[in-house]
């Protein structure tokens, strides 16, 4: 038997000066143009021109369009993850303090963050498990402001099943974009 050493074709380099310059320019533009710049880049790269923040009306419309089998499956997964997260919090979340030496104390106190950003991949497939795992656990932990973010499909926006799942699991805001610059200005991060 003969084993050949084959090399994959070279891909575009990300370690050259021109690439770094392009990325730095994009990031600088995003810092100054904020949501407008994000919308422009989403239009350019993702071929999506819709709203960045998914409205309550759109969520309700999507909820009605999802078939019952999918809804049942998502609810089943959500319930399982929620039950486990609650048990984990109950059994792991015990605060404690010990005196290591006279006057020197160490301990643990679990405090949820105010805001959690939950990225939900949405390339060729709707990765609803990412929505279930990240949004549900943040909700159980007591996070007050949960923002779910998923990339858009051309001319569609985020996958409807991702939007349905993020909403069911307790996301407070659902955005369609790749960047954190699309967080609503009302968020306290």
Locate each region found by the language model.
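A glycine-rich helix N-cap at a beta->alpha junction
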Residues: 165-178
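Conserved small/polar residues in nucleotide/adenosyl-binding loops
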Residues: 1-5, 179-185
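N-terminal Rossmann-like NAD(P)+-binding subdomain of aldehyde/semialdehyde dehydrogenases
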Residues: 4-114
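Conserved small-residue-rich beta-alpha loop and adjacent elements
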Residues: 98-165
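Alpha-helical hinge/cap motifs
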Residues: 34, 142, 180-184
